[in-house]
C-alpha cells in the first residue's frame, strides 16, 4: 500500500540523494518549467523538512487551478490537501523512518509527516508548479463524510493512533480527566430551548419550527428563532407561527451577525432554557421524541454538551448517500484528542446553557459549532447519542453542498486555526501544570515534615542515623566493594511486614486513601496520588500510589513511571515488585527519591549486550545483578523494557 509504513521504509532505503520527491496519485503528472528547481530552492532557503505547492488539476480535459493552504501546528487532519507532489529533505525523511517503530497499513505517510513536523517546517509554495489529473469528481459536500464511512473504519483507527501518539510527543494530549458539571447551579423557567438561526429560508423554516414545536417532553420548553433580517418572506412565516406562545421570534438589532452571533442572541435571551439545542432552519428532528432523548442524555452521561446522530436526506426527507452519520469514531476517553484530527463532531448539538454563555459562540457562519466542541471538550465530557434523532436535508439551496476550492480553503484554514489555538493552549497548560506540580511537591514535603508529627520525627531521626554512616571496603574475590552503611530502625515496620496472601487479606491496605492517617496529605496527578513517605530511607522520599486499590505490577505502568521522571525531575523513580520485598504488594505504587541519593558514578562490572544508536542494554553482575537499559527516547525505552519483561 502506498500509504503504509512499509512503503515509507522502501522509499527511505532507495533514496540516495539530498531530496526525495513523492507523488501520491496513480495518474499522469506534468511538472512545470523549473518546478523541481524552485521546490529545491525554497527547501534550501527555509531548511524545511517538506515543501508542497499550488498546482493545476485536469478534470475531464479542462485545466483548473488548485491552490492549497499553509500548514499550521493544528493542521492535523489526515486528509489535509498538500496536493500530490511532496518534496522531502531526504535526511529528515530517513531519520523519521529509522526511529519509527509502528507499522501502519494506512497511516504510514500521515505518521511520517506528523513526525517530520515535530522537528522541521512544512512549507507551502503558493506558486503553480505542476499539473495532476483528478479522478475524484465528487462535490465537496460528498467528500467531507469519507472519514465516517464504515468501510474506512480500520483506516480511521490507524489515523487516530498516529495522531494520538503525535499529541503525546508534542505535549498536546489530554488524559481522560474531566471537570464535573453541576446542573443545579442555576435556575431556569424552561428546561430546554430549541435554537434556530435563520435567514431567507422560506421553503424550509416552517418544517423546522413545526418539528421543534411538535416535540413531546416531560418538561417545559420553547423555541427561539433568531431571524437574521430575512428578505424572502421568512419573517412573515414566523409571525404566522407565533400564535404558539412557545415560539419566540427575535429579529436582532445588529446587522453584523453570523450564525454564531445569532446563537449568542438566543442563548442570552431571558427565556432561554437550561439546555440550548440545535436545529438548523433546513432540517427537522426525526420524530417527536428527539428533544426528550437529548435532555435525558445530559443527566445520564453527566456532560456539558451532547451530540446526536443524523441521517442525510433529500428535500423530501428521503435517505440519500452517505446515509447515517453517527461519528462512532468518538470514544469517551480519546474523543477530544481525535477531535483535533477530524473536521466535524456531528449533529444535532446541544449545550448546558450556563457553560455556553460563559464560553460564547464565535460570530462566524462556518465552524462555530466545531469551535465550541473543541472548547467544551477541553474541560468537560461530551455525551453521544448513536441513534438517529435528526434529519439533515440536502438540496440546491444548502450553503455547503458544492463549494468552490477558494471557499473550501477558507473553511479549512479557519478550522486549522481553531485546532492550532486549542493545541497551543494544551501545550502551554501542560508546561504550566508540570511547573505547578513540581512546586506543589516541594511545598507538600515542607508542610508534611513540619506539621505531621510522624513524618517530622522520622525525617529528623533519619538525619541523625545518616550522621553515623559507616564506610566499609572489602575484596570479594577479584572485586573490590566500597559501601556506606547506616542503621534506620524506623524502617523496621516495612522491612518486617508480612506479605503472604493470608496476612495481606487480614489487614486493611495502608496505601488506600480511606485507611491512611488523616494527617497524610497528597497531590493528585491523573490516576495517582503523590505522598510524603513517613518512613523514609532518603532525605526526600515520596510514595506515588494508584488512586484505586490495584495489585502491584509494572505491566502497563512502565510508561507512567517514565512520565513521572518528567514531573519529578529532581528525583529518580523506583519500583519494588510484589516478589521483591514490596511491603504493599496489593496496591500499585512507585517510590521517588531525591537524586543526591542516586548511585551514579558507582562502579559496576558490566557486559554490553546491545549497543546501537537507539538503545544500549548491558548486564551488570557486581555488586549485584541487574539489567541496565539506556535509550534515546521514552518510546524506545518502554518498548525495550517490555520486550525484556516478557522474556523474563
For the regions a language model picked out, list residue spans one by one:
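Short, acidic, metal-binding catalytic loop of nucleotide-sugar glycosyltransferases
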Residues: 210-220
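Glycine-rich, basic loop-to-helix element that forms the pyrophosphate-binding segment
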Residues: 2-14, 253-271
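A conserved acidic beta->alpha catalytic loop
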Residues: 28, 227-236, 255
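Conserved donor NDP-sugar-binding/catalytic core segment of glycosyltransferases
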Residues: 28, 33-65, 289-322
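Active-site microenvironments that recognize anionic phosphate/pyrophosphate groups
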Residues: 435-560, 564, 571-578, 583, ...
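A recurrent flexible, glycine/aromatic-enriched loop bordering the glycosyltransferase active site
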Residues: 64-88, 329-350
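Acidic donor-binding loop at a coil-to-helix junction in glycosyltransferase catalytic cores
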Residues: 103-112, 365-372
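Short beta-strand-to-loop acidic/aromatic patch adjacent to the donor-nucleotide binding site
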Residues: 16-30, 273-284
Amino acid at each position: 500500500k502506498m500509504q503504509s509504513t512499509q512503503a515509507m521504509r522502501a522509499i527511505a532505503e532507495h533514496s540516495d540523494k539530498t531530496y526525495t520527491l513523492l507523488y501520491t496519485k496513480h495518474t499522469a503528472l506534468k511538472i512545470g518549467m523549473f518546478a523541481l528547481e524552485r521546490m529545491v530552492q525554497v527547501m534550501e532557503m527555509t531548511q524545511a523538512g517538506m515543501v508542497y505547492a499550488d498546482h493545476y488539476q485536469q478534470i475531464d480535459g479542462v485545466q483548473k487551478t488548485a491552490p492549497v493552504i499553509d500548514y499550521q501546528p493544528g493542521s492535523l487532519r489526515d486528509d489535509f490537501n498538500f496536493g500530490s507532489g511532496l518534496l522531502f529533505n531526504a535526511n529528515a525523511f530517513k531519520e523519521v523512518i529509522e526511529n519509527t517503530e509502528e507499522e501502519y497499513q494506512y497511516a504510514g505517510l500521515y505518521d511520517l509527516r506528523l513526525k517530520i513536523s515535530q522537528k522541521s517546517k512544512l512549507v507551502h509554495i503558493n506558486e503553480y508548479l505542476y499539473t495532476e489529473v483528478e479522478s475524484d469528481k465528487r462535490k465537496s459536500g460528498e467528500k467531507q463524510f469519507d472519514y465516517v464511512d464504515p468501510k474506512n473504519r480500520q483506516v480511521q483507527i490507524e489515523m487516530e493512533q498516529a495522531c494520538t501518539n503525535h499529541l503525546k510527543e508534542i505535549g498536546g494530549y489530554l488524559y481522560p480527566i474531566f471537570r464535573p458539571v453541576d446542573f443545579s447551579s442555576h435556575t431556569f423557567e424552561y428546561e430546554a430551548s430549541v435554537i434556530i438561526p435563520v435567514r431567507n429560508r422560506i421553503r424550509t423554516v416552517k418544517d423546522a419550527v413545526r418539528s421543534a414545536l411538535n416535540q413531546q417532553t416531560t418538561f417545559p420548553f420553547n423555541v427561539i428563532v433568531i431571524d437574521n433580517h430575512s428578505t424572502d418572506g421568512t419573517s412573515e412565516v414566523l409571525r404566522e407561527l407565533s400564535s404558539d406562545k412557545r415560539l419566540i421570534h427575535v429579529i436582532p438589532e445588529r446587522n453584523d451577525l453570523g450564525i454564531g452571533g445569532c446563537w449568542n442572541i438566543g442563548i442570552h435571551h431571558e427565556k432561554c432554557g437550561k439546555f440550548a439545542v440545535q436545529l438548523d432552519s433546513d432540517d427537522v428532528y426525526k420524530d417527536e421524541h428527539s428533544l426528550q432523548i437529548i435532555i435525558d442524555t445530559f443527566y445520564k452521561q453527566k456532560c456539558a454538551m451532547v451530540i446526536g446522530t443524523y441521517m442525510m436526506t433529500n428535500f423530501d426527507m428521503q435517505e440519500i448517500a452517505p446515509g447515517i452519520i453517527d461519528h462512532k469514531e468518538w470514544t469517551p476517553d480519546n474523543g477530544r484528542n481525535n477531535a483535533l484530527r477530524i473536521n466535524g463532531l456531528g449533529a444535532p448539538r446541544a449545550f448546558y446553557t450556563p457553560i455556553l454563555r460563559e464560553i460564547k459562540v464565535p460570530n462566524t457562519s462556518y465552524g462555530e459549532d466545531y469551535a465550541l466542541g473543541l472548547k467544551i471538550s477541553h474541560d468537560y465530557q461530551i455525551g453521544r447519542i448513536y441513534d438517529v434523532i435528526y434529519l439533515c436535508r440536502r438540496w440546491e439551496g444548502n450553503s455547503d453542498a458544492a463549494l468552490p476550492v477558494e471557499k473550501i480553503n477558507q473553511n479549512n484554514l479557519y478550522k486549522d486555526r481553531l485546532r492550532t489555538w486549542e493545541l497551543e493552549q494544551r501545550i502551554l497548560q501542560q508546561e504550566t501544570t508540570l511547573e505547578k506540580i513540581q512546586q506543589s511537591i516541594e511545598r507538600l514535603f515542607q508542610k508534611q515534615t513540619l506539621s505531621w508529627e510522624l513524618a517530622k520525627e522520622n525525617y529528623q531521626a533519619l538525619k541523625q542515623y545518616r550522621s553515623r554512616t559507616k564506610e566499609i571496603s572489602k575484596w570479594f574475590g577479584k572485586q573490590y566493594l566500597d559501601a556506606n552503611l547506616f542503621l534506620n530502625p524506623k524502617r523496621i515496620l516495612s522491612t518486617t511486614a508480612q506479605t503472604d496472601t493470608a496476612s495481606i487479606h487480614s489487614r486493611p491496605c495502608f496505601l488506600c486513601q480511606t485507611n491512611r492517617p488523616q494527617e497524610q496529605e497528597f497531590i493528585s496527578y491523573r490516576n495517582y496520588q503523590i505522598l510524603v513517605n513517613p518512613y523514609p530511607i532518603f532525605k526526600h522520599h515520596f510514595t506515588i500510589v494508584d488512586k484505586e486499590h490495584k495489585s502491584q505490577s509494572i505491566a502497563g505502568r512502565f510508561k507512567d513511571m517514565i512520565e513521572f521522571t518528567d514531573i519529578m525531575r529532581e528525583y529518580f523513580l523506583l519500583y519494588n515488585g510484589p516478589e521483591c520485598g514490596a511491603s504493599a504488594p496489593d496496591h500499585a505504587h512507585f517510590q521517588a527519591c531525591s537524586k543526591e541519593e542516586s548511585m551514579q558514578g558507582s562502579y559496576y562490572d558490566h557486559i554490553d549486550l546491545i549497543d546501537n544508536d537507539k538503545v544500549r542494554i548491558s548486564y551488570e553482575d557486581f555488586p549485584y545483578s541487574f539489567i541496565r537499559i539506556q535509550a534515546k527516547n521514552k518510546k524506545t525505552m518502554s518498548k525495550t523494557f517490555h520486550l525484556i519483561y516478557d522474556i523474563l
